[in-house]
Design a protein with these regions (language model features):
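Receiver (REC) domain active-site loop signature in two-component systems and cognate sites
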Residues: 56
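Active-site residues of response regulator receiver
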Residues: 53, 83
């Protein structure tokens, strides 16, 4: 059975690139434009991994991670940050919120697939 990955980013172009890359590698992909949309979608869709941007309107990536981690069913859900932020302080905030890993944009498609395979198979 295919693994399902949720990609959360306010940039349609970025969601399209991530989705294209992961679908090409055999994953199902669910998209959300911000953290609030992601929370709504994840309530009705089982996902094996969340890949989220940091800076988004309505609900940012750190808030999304904290809210997901507060739900018992999602405490161990792998969550990757995919963002332009490369600052060590931001990475520390991400880890403290519960992020599993961090990938800096622009991303290398092969590296993204490799990380996703390591994290969720």
């Amino acid at each position: 059975m295919k693994k399902t990955v949720m990609t959360v980013d306010d940039s349609r172009t970025m969601r399209d690139m991530v989705s294209f890359t992961l679908r090409g590698a055999g994953y199902e992909v669910v998209e959300a434009a911000d953290g609030q949309q992601a929370m709504s979608a994840i309530a009705t869709t089982k996902v094996d991994l969340v890949i989220t941007d940091l800076n988004m309107p309505v609900m940012d990536g750190l808030t999304l991670i904290r809210r997901l981690r507060a739900i018992p069913a999602h405490r161990t859900l792998p969550i990757l940050m995919l963002t332009t932020e490369a600052d060590d302080g931001k990475k520390a905030e991400g880890r403290a919120a519960g992020a599993t890993g961090w990938i800096v944009k622009p991303f290398n498609p092969d590296k993204l697939v490799s990380v996703v395979q390591k994290v969720c198979g």
